[in-house]
Amino acid sequence: MRILAVTAEMFPFVKTGGLADATSALPQALERKGADVRTLLPLYRGLTPLVRGRKPVLVANILEQPVSVYYVVSDGHKLLLLEAASLFDRDGHPYGVKGEPFADNDLRFAVLSKVAAEIALGAIDGWQPDVVHVHDWHAALTCVYLADSTPSVASVLTLHNLAFQGQYPLERAGMLGLPSHLCTVDCLEYYDDMSFLKGGLTTASAVTTVSPTYAREILTPEMGMGMHGVLARRRGDLRGIVNGVDHDVWNPATDPYILANFTAATATRRSLNKYALLQALGLAPTQGPVFGVVSRLTWQKGIDLLPHVVPLIIERKGRLIVHGEGDTALEDSLQALAKRYPELVCAHIGYDERLAHMIQAGSDFIIQPSRFEPCGLTQLYALRYGALPIVSRTGGLAETIIDANDAAIEAGVATGFQFEPANEDDLRAALERAISAYNDRELFRRLQTQAMQANFSWDKSAAQYMALFESLVGNSTRETDAVADIRTETFAKIRADRRLAGTPGSPTG
């Protein structure tokens, strides 16, 4: 099976978060199952050496932008690198610079999506995909551009985070080559603007999220981010598939970023990594627990809860290490804590892959206090490295971590600690339970071993994706008649709801 993946970021080429890890590991897992996966990725400034001296496989003018596509195999990945210098050859990260998004992000990612659609329809000689797999709002317009194609092309939209929806002025739709009949509440229109994500949700052949729990949560008004109505009508095409861990990248036995490699059988060697981590960050050595946080520093991630539990951590002779970037106010509050407790708290603003690995290998616990979490990868890495996760009971966190309550401890299945989302008191109670377990060395070693033996391989997830792709391709040449019927029914229900509500562009429609 030939699969075209479309994404704005992919490790090790460009990464701002877990999306890059997922879009890197899944294609390789699918390849191991016999698929031919090629990933369309923008040629950002730092990637230009990859195409130097190569001939493009596609040259075109897309939305009045000259573009070239190069086929490159690098780091085990089959890449289709999209060169559009005026759009992607820039300073900053993929979406903006100095915390501000680029003003033309709608055009940038519309071009990415339009090129993906052209490739899906056979624009590259000798290779045409059976399925297009697009990730998040950046690539969601691919499904919209393919909506009227003949023959139809099967497409799957994976939601890594529903909070990001690609919302732009509707009057820019013409510039993006979007036909007027799709610029309505039936598809793209969203509160008189347009939402790339909503367009993808209504036109994709199937929709996936990165955990079954999150797939259920987003059907509710509380967690659906205004899209719960659209998602409810696609319920039959919506499923959750848990992300996995890339064992080639996240493997404590071979990790080149850490001082002392180890396995579950030699987990006592983690103490060497703990000492090295504290020393590298200028923190005082301790016999107490080290708590690590590797995260975007945002309200969604619950980072605002951390300052409230620092006194408890310090009182118990612990250390807190926070690594990430995000909201300026949260960054400032964490840096203020680090300044107040210079040998006890570290706030490392930014992202460094080596430090992320060191924190997993040297921390005793990893805290993830997210208010909502589609899947989460950090807690899966923590399991692999024996850093017991302390997570909020939501989304993929609830699904992948087994709370160390009395029953789970007795059954020998506990792998971490859970608490109620956005609940400071419950987080404090979870920390108390974790510290108590840490002080019981026999119990703590047992929990570490159970955590490290948890299996979240990408091969399991890839098998579910392959089954989905095969069902879409196998039920018809490209897209099943049933999917087309569901889409028509969805549009009709949306129109009916809009008339009843009397609200143009309702987000639930």
UniProtKB/Swiss-Prot annotation:
CDD domains (UniProt xref): GT5_Glycogen_synthase_DULL1-like
Keyword line: Glycogen biosynthesis, Glycosyltransferase, Plasmid, Transferase
InterPro entries in alphabetical order: Glyco_trans_1 (IPR001296), GS/SS (IPR011835), Starch_synth_cat_dom (IPR013534)
Keyword Secreted: no
Pfam families, per the entry: Glyco_transf_5 (PF08323), Glycos_transf_1 (PF00534)
One GO-annotated biological process of the protein: glycogen biosynthetic process
Name of this chain's protein: Glycogen synthase 2
Gene source species: Agrobacterium fabrum (strain C58 / ATCC 33970) (Agrobacterium tumefaciens (strain C58))
